[in-house]
């Protein structure tokens, strides 16, 4: 009897030890399984559309064109008919643009809801609150070839005349020529005021006196008028004497 009990005791000890080992391994396995199930994969969608260049066949330009979604986060390619499909895109707001070295396309913003509903609108960087809806699937039309260079301006006479140095030389000359014709030079008070104002401007004594120049200019014209008047009166008097 005692021998049987001593033979059963090691078996019981082994059973107890194996139960402890299994109980210690189960929480670790449960923890590992809960961590893997916490990482979820959301739904993915696709953006569809068509790019068109008026008057040009798609085969002539689609080989060098690409469809970019948010820069280069998602890249798509054009089919032979100009259509495109960009797959594996999660819900959110994206800027879709067709990039081509020969033609320019305006970018379009596409909003994708969690249920897969699409909404397209123009990209307006100036008025961000302004929303202009576009049809979906996208219909992207080229606005013409891109302008990589600025056209050089041609030279014209207006550029020469509007030069500040030319204006500084021409305007004083026009003033000296046109002012005596506009102002009544026979009025001595007006002449005196003009001479005083010109003397105030002529502060440098090394320069010629402007008032003296104006006096000579006006006196020459007045003397010419007086001489012409006297000659006319002389001729009329001689005619009367005859």
Curated annotation (Swiss-Prot):
Region (Disordered): 217-242
Record topological domains on the Cytoplasmic side: 181-242
GO terms of biological process kind: protein insertion into ER membrane by stop-transfer membrane-anchor sequence; tail-anchored membrane protein insertion into ER membrane
An example Gene Ontology molecular-function term: carbohydrate binding
Subcellular location as annotated: Endoplasmic reticulum membrane
SUPFAM superfamilies per UniProt: Starch-binding domain-like
Superkingdom to which the source organism belongs: Eukaryota
Main location, first listed in the record: endoplasmic reticulum
Pfam families noted in UniProt: EMC7_beta-sandw (PF09430)
Keywords assigned by UniProt, alphabetized: Endoplasmic reticulum, Membrane, Signal, Transmembrane, Transmembrane helix
Topological domains annotated Lumenal: 24-159
Signal peptide positions on this chain: 1-23
Lipid bilayer topology: Single-pass type I membrane protein
A GO CC term assigned to this protein in UniProt: EMC complex
Keyword Transmembrane helix among record annotations: yes
Membrane-spanning residues: 160-180
Bias kind Low complexity: ranges: 219-235
Functional note: Part of the endoplasmic reticulum membrane protein complex (EMC) that enables the energy-independent insertion into endoplasmic reticulum membranes of newly synthesized membrane proteins. Preferentially accommodates proteins with transmembrane domains that are weakly hydrophobic or contain destabilizing features such as charged and aromatic residues. Involved in the cotranslational insertion of multi-pass membrane proteins in which stop-transfer membrane-anchor sequences become ER membrane spanning helices.
Subunit record text: Component of the ER membrane protein complex (EMC).
Family: Belongs to the EMC7 family.
Protein name: Endoplasmic reticulum membrane protein complex subunit 7
Gene: EMC7
């Amino acid at each position: 009897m005692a021998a049987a009990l001593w033979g059963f005791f090691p078996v019981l000890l082994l059973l107890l030890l194996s139960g402890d080992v299994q109980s210690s391994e189960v929480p670790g396995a449960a923890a590992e399984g809960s961590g893997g199930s916490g990482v979820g994969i959301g739904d993915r969608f696709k953006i569809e559309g068509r790019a068109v260049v008026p008057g040009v066949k798609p085969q002539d330009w689609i080989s060098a064109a690409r469809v970019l979604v948010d820069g280069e986060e998602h890249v798509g390619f054009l089919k032979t008919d100009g259509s495109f499909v960009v797959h594996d895109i999660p819900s959110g707001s994206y800027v879709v643009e067709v990039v081509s070295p020969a033609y320019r396309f305006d970018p379009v913003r596409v909003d994708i809801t969690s249920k897969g509903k699409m909404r397209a609108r123009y990209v307006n960087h100036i008025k961000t609150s302004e929303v202009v809806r576009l049809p979906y699937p996208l219909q992207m039309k080229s606005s013409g070839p891109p302008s990589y260079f600025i056209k050089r301006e041609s030279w014209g006479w207006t550029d020469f005349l509007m030069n500040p140095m030319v204006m500084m030389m021409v305007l004083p000359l026009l003033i000296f020529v046109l002012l005596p014709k506009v102002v009544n030079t026979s009025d001595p008070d007006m002449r005196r005021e003009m001479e005083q104002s010109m003397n105030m401007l002529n502060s440098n004594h090394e320069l010629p006196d402007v008032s003296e120049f104006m006096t000579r200019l006006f006196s020459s014209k007045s003397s010419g008028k007086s001489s012409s008047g006297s000659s006319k009166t002389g001729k009329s008097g001689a005619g009367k004497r005859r």
